[in-house]
């Protein structure tokens, strides 16, 4: 999610996730996902221990979301460099998720592909600059979505690619 180790994760559960989280393994699954584990990883039951060994501080609480999917979680993540990312994810069944918001802006993507998230100002040329950089690195874009708070304000590009994006 952050292209760097996550050192702190505040995980806020909502709806049925909040009601059944511990009993259904929701907390374990979310922590495993933050560690980058695939859904068939045999280490998932040990995700809390592995997160501790990786230096990840984890806390759980209750999310206050409006009009959210009943199986939602709000994640407030802090990376090793101090940058924060806030996302709301929805469990849509079959071990699949949908990201419904990024840093307070509505979104709608799965994360099934290597995903680049770019924060920028909503100004002409930013999209062209990013897509040009990807082209020069021979990275093909599978999907691209743009979200903004308002004209000229904070914006986010969500770019799902066919391969990992080189640094």
Regions found by a protein language model. Give the residues of each.
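Alpha-helical support elements that line or immediately flank enzyme active sites
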Residues: 1-2, 127
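N-terminal glycine-rich anion-binding loops that anchor highly charged ligand groups
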Residues: 2-10, 15-25
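Short secondary-structure junctions
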Residues: 2-4, 52-57, 135-141
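General beta-strand structural signal in soluble alpha/beta enzymes
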Residues: 13, 59-60
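A conserved regulatory-domain signal marking ACT and ACT-like small-molecule sensing domains
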Residues: 22, 29-37, 42-46, 60-63, ...
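Short, catalytically relevant binding-site loops at active-site mouths
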Residues: 65-67
């Amino acid at each position: 999610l952050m292209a760097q180790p996550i050192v702190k994760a505040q995980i806020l559960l909502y709806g049925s996730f909040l009601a059944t989280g511990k009993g259904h393994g929701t907390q374990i699954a979310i922590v495993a996902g933050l560690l980058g584990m695939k859904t068939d990883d045999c280490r998932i039951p040990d995700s809390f221990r592995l997160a501790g060994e990786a230096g990840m501080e984890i806390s759980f609480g209750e999310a206050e979301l409006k009009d959210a999917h009943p199986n939602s979680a709000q994640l407030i993540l802090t990376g090793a460099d101090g940058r924060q990312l806030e996302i709301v994810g929805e469990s849509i069944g079959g071990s699949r998720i949908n990201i419904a918001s990024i840093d307070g802006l509505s979104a709608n993507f799965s994360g099934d592909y290597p995903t680049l998230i770019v924060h920028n100002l909503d100004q002409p040329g930013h999209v062209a600059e990013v897509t040009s950089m990807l082209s020069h690195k021979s990275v093909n874009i599978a999907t691209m979505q743009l979200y903004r708070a308002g004209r000229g304000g904070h914006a986010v590009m969500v770019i799902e690619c066919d391969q990992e994006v080189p640094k």
